[in-house]
C-alpha cells in the first residue's frame, strides 16, 4: 500500500518518533508503514487521517496487482 505519511510528516517537520507518539505506535511501525513494508490497521489509518485532517484515501492508496 502506497502512502504519503513521510511527506505529510516532513511538511510538519516531525520525526518518525513524533508521528509514532501521536499515533501511539512504535517508531519502527511508522518506519515500516512509510516504506510500504507494513499496512496499517483500519483504526490506525483512521487515526492518521484525523491527525492530518485528511480523508484516508488522500494518505493511503491501494497498489493494483
Feature names for model-found ranges:
Residues 18, 29, 58:
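Residues in the helix-turn-helix
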Residues 22, 33, 62:
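Residues in the recognition helix of alpha-helical DNA-binding motifs
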Residues 25-38:
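Recognition helix of helix-turn-helix/homeodomain-like DNA-binding domains
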Residues 3-22:
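Short basic helix-loop element that most often maps to the first helix and adjoining turn
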Residues 43-58:
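DNA major-groove recognition helix of helix-turn-helix/homeodomain DNA-binding modules
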Residues 58-65:
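Short amphipathic recognition helices of helix-turn-helix/homeodomain-type DNA-binding modules
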Amino acid at each position: 500500500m502506497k502512502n504519503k505519511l513521510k511527506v505529510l510528516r516532513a511538511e510538519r517537520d516531525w520525526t518518525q518518533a513524533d508521528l509514532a507518539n501521536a499515533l501511539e505506535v512504535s517508531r519502527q511501525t511508522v518506519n515500516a508503514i512509510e516504506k510500504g513494508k507494513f499496512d496499517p490497521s483500519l483504526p490506525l489509518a483512521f487515526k492518521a487521517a484525523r491527525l492530518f485532517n485528511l480523508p484516508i484515501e488522500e494518505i493511503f492508496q491501494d497498489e493494483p496487482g
